[in-house]
Design a protein with these regions (language model features):
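Conserved N-terminal glycine-rich FAD pyrophosphate-binding loop of Rossmann-like flavoproteins
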Residues: 40-65, 96-107
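A short, basic/flexible loop-to-alpha-helix module at the beginning of a structural domain
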Residues: 1-7
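Conserved redox-cofactor binding core of oxidoreductases
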Residues: 59-61, 67-76, 85-92, 121-125, ...
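A generic secondary-structure signal for well-formed alpha-helical elements
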Residues: 25-26, 30-34, 40-46, 113-117, ...
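FAD cofactor-binding and catalytic pocket of flavoenzymes
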Residues: 78-95, 99-102, 106, 112-121, ...
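A glycine-rich dinucleotide-binding beta-alpha-beta segment and adjacent secondary-structure elements
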Residues: 7, 219-222, 241-245, 281-286, ...
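N-terminal Rossmann-like FAD-binding beta1-loop-alpha1 element of flavoenzymes
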Residues: 8-35
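Glycine-rich loop(s) and the adjacent beta-strand/alpha-helix scaffold that form part
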Residues: 28, 32, 39-56, 261, ...
């Protein structure tokens, strides 16, 4: 029989960035907040201390900080006509687990949204006409504007200790010719810290980008360029470019995370409680089916526990938020055949391409073992709608950047085209390329489509007997057209760098989604916000 705990004002499901932020906001409002985290307690000390945290085999290859896919995963198929199978080996994306969630192992790249992308359908219809949006593409406006969100972006950067170079502040140009982004929207204040130093790779890239007419700028980075104390009193140390960011906890307290930037303040508040190893299985509803009354979870001993609360904040990873809504009977499940329902609708990912430039050993020493997760130089000339999409014939844009995050000895061993895949020739190629290459990425936007959606799997279940989430997803023609376009535009920078060889990794005509090729962990949609309950799962306040 399930044990019922004393009622709380608020129960928060998941303690990553969203859970930490909402917990801090609501405790400051005077509410008693309980956060439930499915994974273990994690903190810089003892879990991320030097030198243990700089262990590529444990954290990257064996994925210590990520979700255990033997217990909980998603099933994947390309189309509704296919049979989905469980994803038992992480590859295309890396959901986090434990206190901090994916916010503990992220890199620290910290952009703001482009104002246009918050009203994307309206913008494209106004500029290019309704027929420009392909049939089956289901993009819609968010129901909020950049101006409404700007004060919150500003405060978040102060909490994160973000390093960067503003271009305009309150309409005044302050970063022209100094590394600011001429395409960036206006800001109410500058970044809390100046931009980090740039790597040799980034400087070579920036010079080449400028030579072909693009507009390079310093990437905003949630890796500190100097000592910093945030508004909550959390202290951060300056980044030392150790190269162990993405997939790791930062032993220098330099990378923003819920663990470093918010949890220290929450621990001092008696109104806050954090329980770990608590797997939430249901959001409990009142008899009206519309009011949340709390949650049911499985504790570390395997006992079922009911936690009543006046407010339930669903703050777990994107996949799990959608799954919990479906398991709990919240909202109407999306049906792609009739294009009705909202929960599971508009699932989207990211559309990546990578180009590597290989130099001769007497050209440039790029020292790729040096790095910071969010640091680098980017161009936005082909991001958002900063260019004419009409002749290009697709929806979406992409920034290009060089973000030298630190090449590790197991995975960070690229070789130039033509190098043997094994043996002495491969070893020679690795040695020649390791500190003589530059890698650049197009982090392309990915649109939502009627054919791509999330639902409950009818066959496979998790360790607790609940249906797994099923991901129906594949690249669409618009994605491939955009990716090929971005490869071409980014190649201009690569060629201008004057290397001896170039390799391109991106989509081709007929490409399908591949679970082995890492894209990012930027998974979106499924419980989308908006102003129309007929097309959105939650309102503009995420209720």
């Amino acid at each position: 029989m399930a044990k019922t705990m004393p009622k709380k004002d608020v129960v928060v499901i998941g303690f990553g960035w969203t859970g930490a932020i909402i917990s801090k906001e609501l405790t400051e409002a005077g509410l008693n907040v309980l956060a439930l985290e499915r994974g273990p307690m994690q903190d810089t000390d003892p879990d991320g201390v030097y030198p243990q945290t700089m262990d590529e085999l444990t954290f990257n290859s064996r994925k210590k900080l990520f979700v255990d896919v033997s217990k909980e995963t998603v099933t994947i198929r390309h189309t509704s006509a296919d049979t989905a199978l469980p994803n038992r080996q992480l590859g295309a994306f890396l959901p986090g687990n434990g206190v901090g969630g994916a916010g503990l192992h992220w890199s620290g790249v910290h952009f703001r949204v482009d104002p246009m992308e918050l009203r994307m359908r309206s913008h494209y219809e106004e500029r290019y006409g309704k027929k420009f949006i392909p049939e089956g593409m289901t993009i819609q406006d968010f129901g909020v504007t950049y101006d409404e969100l700007e004060p919150h972006f500003d405060f978040a950067e102060k909490v994160f200790g973000t390093s960067g170079t503003a271009y305009t502040v309150k309409g005044e140009k302050v970063g022209a010719g100094k590394g600011g982004n001429p395409f960036a929207p206006d800001r109410s204040s500058d970044f809390p810290l100046p931009a980090q130093m740039n790597s040799v790779s980034a400087m070579l890239y920036g010079k080449a980008a400028e030579s072909v007419g693009y507009h390079p700028y310093n990437m905003p980075s949630a890796n500190t360029s100097g000592p910093y104390t945030n508004p909550y009193g959390a202290q951060m140390g300056p980044c030392n470019f150790c190269g162990f960011c993405s997939g790791y906890a930062c032993y220098m307290y330099s990378k923003a995370s819920p663990n470093v930037n918010i949890l220290p303040a929450l621990r001092l508040d008696p109104r806050f409680e954090l329980r770990t190893l608590c797997q939430v299985t249901r959001i409990n509803l009142a008899a009206d089916g519309k009011t949340a009354t709390g949650v049911t979870y499985i504790d570390a001993s395997g006992n079922e526990v009911i936690q009543p609360a006046d407010i339930v904040a669903v703050c777990s990873f994107q996949f799990n938020n959608v799954r919990l809504m479906l398991l709990s009977g919240i909202g109407k499940p999306y049906d792609p055949e009739s294009n009705t329902g909202t929960v599971g609708k508009n699932f989207a990912f990211q559309n990546m391409a990578t180009i590597k430039v290989f130099f001769g050993k007497d050209q440039h020493h790029t020292n790729n073992f040096i790095g910071a997760g969010g640091n680098g130089i980017a161009v936005d000339d082909f991001n958002a709608d900063n260019f004419d999409h009409g002749p290009a014939g697709f929806v979406g844009g992409s920034p290009f950047w060089v973000n030298q995050a630190g090449a590790k000895p197991i995975a960070g061993t690229p070789t130039a085209p033509g190098t043997p895949n094994w043996g002495s020739g491969w070893k020679k190629g690795v040695a020649e390329a390791y500190t003589h290459n530059v890698s650049m990425d197009a982090h392309g936007a990915h649109q939502s489509y009627r054919a791509n959606y999330l639902s409950l799997d009818p066959t496979y279940k998790d360790a607790y007997g609940n249906p797994l989430l099923r991901m129906t997803f594949d690249w669409q023609p618009n994605d491939i057209r955009m990716n090929l376009f971005m490869q071409d535009k980014m190649s201009a920078i690569a060629k201008a760098m004057g290397g001896q060889a170039i390799s391109i990794s991106g989509k081709k005509e007929g490409s399908h989604f591949d679970t082995n090729s890492y894209q990012t962990t930027h998974l979106n949609g499924g419980a989308i916000m908006g102003t129309d309950p007929g097309t959105s799962a939650v309102n503009r306040y995420l209720q």
